[in-house]
Amino acid sequence: MHRTIFTTPVVNTLLRGLSLTILKLTGWRVEGSLPPDCPKCVVIAAPHTSNWDLPNTLIAGFALRMNLYWMGKRSIFAPPFGALMRWLGGIAVNREKSTNLVAASVDAIRAADGPLQLVVPPEGTRGATRHWKTGFYYIALGAKVPIVMAYMDYQRKLS
């Protein structure tokens, strides 16, 4: 996988401190932690309903010392923000055509040297859906990694 803000040592340390401060100042709490025996996993974060999900996920990721990668629609990776989005752990997804994303994700997780948590919104969109897409399941199955469930409760300020 590509180098990210989570794998940049000094920046990671500074942003962890900043994230913990932001959580405290805004009244948010991060509950739970990653299971200790899963350095690699697929994290499904639901429901994905707000543009604030990404910054809040990054903050929670720093607080939990995660090495996050996340999937986002291709349009947010366009210039001038594309390089920044990739450095934040983003992986562009073209939702308009089939691109073997599951197979590529499986290969990337298997090839990763260290810890890696791939965040996938199971709905595939911020809009209302009646059911989840299944890509996250097949990524985890193919990579032989666990699925970890996560959430953002904006009303109670819990993550």
Annotate each language-model stretch with its function.
Residues 25-159:
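Soluble catalytic domains of membrane acyltransferases
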Residues 1-30:
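Extreme N-terminal tail/first-helix region
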